[in-house]
From Swiss-Prot:
The keyword Protein biosynthesis applies. SUPFAM superfamilies: Translation initiation factor 2 beta, aIF2beta, N-terminal domain, Zinc-binding domain of translation initiation factor 2 beta. eIF-2 functions in the early steps of protein synthesis by forming a ternary complex with GTP and initiator tRNA. This is Translation initiation factor 2 subunit beta. It comes from Haloarcula marismortui (strain ATCC 43049 / DSM 3752 / JCM 8966 / VKM B-1809) (Halobacterium marismortui).
Length: 134
């Protein structure tokens, strides 16, 4: 059997891989309006997926959206003002770029640590350390 024939046969027998090539996906925000308040229903699952403290993510959201808010007893975020899911998702994406993904290798295997008052992002995959905007 020729090499090209074997290669063609192998390609035919190889199953298709479904899904994305990325292993890190942030859940889409589940948003609803209650009057002039935006409720972020799945905030806790987003934070756990990001591997970050609720308060840190909340502080970023408040600053980025220019509003006030709080985390209620059910773990939902209640933001003052009307924000659609697209705007919340864009803000979470900014958070991920700044505080979750490694600037060197792009992997989410990072931890936040303070050193001499500065907040650093330390990558457990490649060992890189980078400063954050905070």
């Amino acid at each position: 059997m020729e090499y090209d024939d074997m290669l063609d046969r192998a390609m035919e027998e190889t199953p298709e891989i479904d899904g994305t090539s990325e292993r890190f996906e942030v859940p889409d925000p589940d948003i609803r309006q209650e009057g002039n308040v935006t409720v972020y229903e799945n905030f806790q699952s987003t934070c756990s997926r990001l591997g970050r403290e609720d308060d840190h993510v909340m502080k970023f959201l408040q600053n980025d959206l220019g509003t006030s808010g709080h985390i209620d007893e059910s773990g939902r975020v209640r933001l003052t003002g009307e924000f659609d899911a697209t705007r919340i998702e864009a803000s979470i994406d900014e958070y991920v770029d700044e505080f979750v993904l490694c600037s060197e290798c792009g992997l989410p295997d990072t931890q936040l640590e303070r050193e001499q008052g500065a907040l650093l992002l330390r990558c457990e995959a490649c060992g890189a350390r980078s400063a954050t905007s905070e």
